[in-house]
Every structure is written in structure tokens, then in C-alpha cells.
Design a protein with these regions (language model features):
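Glycine-rich phosphate/pyrophosphate-handling loop used in enzymes and phosphotransfer proteins
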Residues: 1-224
Length: 224
């Protein structure tokens, strides 16, 4: 099997049991060498956005909290570096649905630790669904029980990666509930997204769910 990122041939690691039951070892879409190049976020982090920081909350998050936005306590697994950008380029923008397997187990394990009563993926617009064919976040969460209770108000939107930081911060509420008047009283919700950039998207989603009675909300992103 060829690694989707570097093009090298992958050699699966066989166990004695594999030989006896004629079972071919499972291989992910990318090789071990490429997986090792993703940078895990470790050490002191901002408890609000998940970035590596000696100060918590970091200066950026202090602005959000001072402005009255509720805390989201984001947990980010990896740095959004060159390796991660290459992965997203192929996964999100070049139809790489098969690459969803790379981070499925890691995200599932993190969500087990978070232990929310509901897991809510950030939705995509109808236009994006038609173009891409899948929601990149929901695809990662195939091994989890998810609650797709948020939807996009508009059927189309400007691509987030093309917006300036100022434009991201000024976006209006893009989400609403799939079911009007849904009662989320008592629910401890974890919102999952792909990348934490400014935090605007996660805070929009969080506000929408709090307005419907959610008791506690935290967030998890693959990258920061």
C-alpha cells in the first residue's frame, strides 16, 4: 500500500496470529514515518484555546473572556504546521475521504476521556457538502456516537481559509439548531472541529447550544 502523503510503499507489521488466520495487517492511509511528523501539542497550554503557552488564559483568549464570551476549554491534539497543512490539503480539498482513518482512533480516545453526554460536530454548508462530498469532522467521528444537531443557516459561505483574521472575527452567527426549540437542559456537550484558528466558529456554535439550555460545553479540535 502506498502512503498518500510521501508516496512510499508501506510494509505492514505481521504478527504470528496474522499468519495463522490468514489475516492481512491493517494499514492506515499514511505511513508511520509521516505519522511521526505530526507535532503533538504538549507541555503547558492555554486552558481556553489549547495552544502551547506559559500563560493561561493566553492574551488572545483573555480578550474573548473579557468581552463576556463563555469559556470553551478547547483541547487541541496537534500543531497546525506544514505537515498538518499538507494533510488537510489532500483530505479536505482534494477529495481525500479515505484519509479520515489517520486520526479516527486518536479523536475517539480523547472523547472517551472528555466523556460528554453529547458529541456535536461543526456542520458544513450544503454547498460544501455537494462540492466535497463529506463533512471532514463527522468522517473522523465514525467510531463515535455523534449528535448532528447544528446546521448552517446559509447554504453557502465564504471559505474560512480564504478569510483574513479580521474577517473571521467579524462573522455573524452561521449556525442554528436542526430542530427548533430543542431542549438541551442538563447536557454536557463537546463540540468537535478541525482547526482552532481564532475560535470564532467554536464560540458561535457554543452560544447557539447554550441558548438552548446546555449545561456545560467544551471543545476538541484536531489542530491549533
Amino acid at each position: 500500500m502506498t502512503c498518500e502523503l510521501c508516496g512510499r510503499i508501506q510494509q505492514g507489521e505481521w504478527t504470528l496470529g496474522d499468519f495463522f488466520i490468514f489475516h492481512q495487517p491493517q494499514m492506515l492511509s499514511i505511513c508511520e514515518a509521516c505519522r511521526q511528523q505530526f507535532t503533538r501539542i504538549t507541555g503547558p497550554v492555554c486552558a481556553e484555546c489549547g495552544c502551547q503557552s506559559q500563560i493561561s488564559p493566553c492574551a488572545e483568549c483573555e480578550i474573548w473572556l473579557t468581552a463576556g464570551y463563555p469559556a470553551i476549554h478547547n483541547q487541541a491534539l496537534f500543531a497546525y504546521d506544514e505537515q498538518m497543512q499538507q494533510y488537510f490539503k489532500q483530505y479536505k480539498f482534494q477529495g481525500g475521504y479515505h484519509l479520515r482513518d489517520v486520526f479516527q482512533d486518536m479523536l475517539a480516545q480523547r472523547l472517551v476521556k472528555v466523556a460528554p453526554t453529547m458529541i456535536v460536530p461543526i456542520p458544513i454548508t450544503t454547498e460544501t457538502q455537494n462540492q466535497r462530498g463529506f463533512n471532514q469532522v463527522s468522517a473522523w467521528l465514525e467510531k463515535c456516537e455523534i449528535n448532528e444537531i447544528l446546521t448552517c443557516i446559509s447554504n453557502s459561505k465564504a471559505v474560512q481559509s480564504m478569510k483574513t483574521r479580521r474577517e473571521r472575527l467579524q462573522t455573524t452567527q452561521p449556525f442554528c439548531l436542526v430542530t427548533e426549540n430543542l431542549d438541551l437542559t442538563g447536557q454536557r456537550i463537546c463540540i468537535v472541529d478541525d482547526v482552532y484558528t481564532t475560535g470564532r466558529t467554536l464560540r458561535h456554535a457554543s452560544s447557539c447550544l447554550y441558548e438552548s439550555g446546555a449545561t456545560q460545553i467544551c471543545t476538541v479540535t484536531l489542530a491549533r
